[in-house]
Each structure stands twice: as structure tokens, then as C-alpha cells.
């Protein structure tokens, strides 16, 4: 059984309220942190090996250490709660049921970074959660954990909740900052990075909800103890949003030492696939990471078990692996159509493109049109090659990662399921009434000729 750090008290009735949260050890980590020097907390976070839980997996302590500290210039912490990645909902769970865990993490993080004004930028579709957060903020303020001279330390902190307007692109940190400043959420060119020139041109750290919440157990048990949980550079625990064709969808906390097979089939987690269906494929890190077929999901190309951690999921690169991403674990059974699924994702990314970069603005539209054509039984064999060519023109040629996020699902679908795409082209009428089923996987590593 995985060790619980973030969700250990999630089952307790009323845990979202200050009194109950406090009764079960809440804000003890904050009290401990406020007696430490900011640089000591930073070292604990570095020692813990905590990596950003929003998708990129960049070391949190290192990111904090980049924060510029010019004399007399305010600094800010911004929590990225614009959780809009299809298949990802773990941050929503934290904010809805454990809002004080996030606020405590923000208090510790803001104290470490020297931010006296911090923000939570929340996805517009989470319309009911800002009220929960604002109530928790008022409770914390009434108890002396927010506001002026917190616990007599001389440290001041105000936290504000800002609602987004439903744009996926605002999950990109610089687009988020643009929106927070009241402008259209278009990503900025980097450098300068937010740590140097962020919100209102001030040094700013932007972190994911789960990343900030994880600071609380790091201070509770110490960075060294936190680093012992997990394996290698995948330290601590990770929240996984499990959905799709599984018996037990939901949010699970894992310590990243379990195998993918155990996560899917164990009763402790997903509980297997309904109705005894076969596993066809999985997207383990949210819609933007490469889809992998069952034969490469449960084992690596070398035949070793694949584990639920950053390194193991990425084993083999994009040729045979994928990414941990945001932890949006989407399972597809044998009845699912990969062409239809890829088309749905392409439609999403085309709709959510901000339009600033031509490769993304035009490319996502054309990928959706071609996939729709193939899915309707009107495609030609050259359309598959055209799709491949378009995604190559998008990847790496945009200001922000949305272009890559749109290209990777298409590339992986063609790489691993080309036979299914060809079946749609060769069987236009049949493809409208039945699905292809389990793919006839080709060897993803073609043999190299010695001639």
C-alpha cells in the first residue's frame, strides 16, 4: 500500500474546515517553518527532490532558487490552478476537499520566497471552488495564519483567488500571468523567465497546486525523509487522476514504486477493466503526452516492468515510452477507436490554440480536419503521411508548449496504431459500424539493415 502524505486526512468528515484541519495536525508544518530561516526551508525542498507536479517535472527547489531578489522590488507566488488538461482532475480534488492544505503550503512557500501577496489562478469551469478557497482563506486569517504579522513573526501575507475565463492556454505560466494582469492570455517569449520578470514585471514563481501542497509534508517529515519515499529522482508521492475504461475511476496517491500493471489491475487502485475487456492503450500523463499501446505500457521495450514514475514511463523516449505529465491516467479498452480518440484531442487543441503562432494556429486546424476525414471513412492513405508531416512542422516551432502538446498525441497514435488508421482508409463503410479492436502492433524499433 502506498504511503499517504497529501491525502492522509482526506477521508475525515469536515476536513475542509479550519477547526477540523487544525485538530488533525494542520498548520503545524507552517508553525515549524516560520521558526526557520527561508534559506533553510529552501534547502529542505531541494533535498526532498520534489519535482513540479503540473507536467514538466522540473525540480521545485531549483526553480525557487532562480527567483531574482532585487532590493525593494516585491516578489510573488502564483499557484497555477488552471487545471484544464483533459483527463486531469487531481488539483480540483485538493482544492475542493483539502483547501487548507493548499493554503498552508502557500504560507510556507510565500515565506520562503519573500512573497507578501500571493495568488491562486483557478480554472473558470471550477465555478464552485473559489468560494471554498475564499472561505478557507478567511478562516486562516481569523486564526492568525494569514494577514499582518503572522504568529508574531513580522511576516505579512495576503492570498487572492482569481477566476479564469475557461482558456486552456492560461495553464501556460506566462499566459496565466498575462491573464492575471487583465490582458488576453497569450504566452510570452522566454527569456526573460517569470523568476526574473513575471507578474507586473516583478520576480514571480508559478507552481502547480499539488507542488505547493507537497511542501507541507516536506516540512513535516524533513526533506531527507521525503526523498526516501519513491525511487531515484521520482521522490515523494504523486496524485494520479485515473479515468477511462476502469472499474474505479478517481484520484489516487501513489509513491511511484508500483508498476503500471499493479495500478491498473489492483483493487487498491483502478480495479481492472470493466466486463473483462482487454487493455488496448493508455495515456498516463494527461491528453498531451504520447499514447502507448498495451504491449509497451506494462513493459518497456527491454521487457522490464514499467513503473508509475517519471523515469520508467519515459524509458525508451517517445519511440517506445511516454511521460508522467500531470498524472491524468486515461485507460482505453479494446472497444475504443484510436482514430476517433485522436480526432477528439485534435479538436480540443485546435479550439484552445490562442492563435499567436502560425504552426499551432493553422496546424491544429488541419490535423483536426484530416482526422475527421479519416474517421468518417473519407480518408486516403496519403492523409496519414500528411498528418505525420504536419505534426512535425508544429513541434518545437511555437512560443509555448501547446504546439508540442497538440503534436505528440497525433505522432504517437500514428507511430503505434498506423494499422488502425490504414484500416479506416481501406474499410470506409465498415469503420462506421464497428471498431478495429486490438491493434496488430508493429515492432516500434525497425530492424537496421547491415547492407
What does each of the following model-derived ranges do?
Residues 130-256, 272-274:
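Hydrophobic alpha-helical positions that pack around
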Residues 29-44, 73-75, 81, 90-95, ...:
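Ferredoxin-type iron-sulfur electron-transfer modules in oxidoreductases and energy-metabolism complexes
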Residues 98-112:
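Histidine-anchored nucleotide/phosphate-binding helix
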Residues 105-109, 256-274:
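Short amphipathic, charge-patterned alpha-helical segments
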Residues 47-67, 166-178, 182-184, 350-362, ...:
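Conserved phosphate/anionic-ligand binding catalytic regions in large, soluble enzymes, centered on
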Residues 56, 62-64, 88-91, 130-135, ...:
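Short acidic, glycine/serine/threonine-rich loops at helix termini
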Residues 21-26, 79-91, 194-199, 241-247:
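Gly-rich Lys/Arg/Thr-decorated short loops/hinges at beta-loop-alpha junctions or inter-strand turns
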Residues 1-44:
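Cofactor-/ligand-binding subdomain signature composed of acidic, glycine-rich
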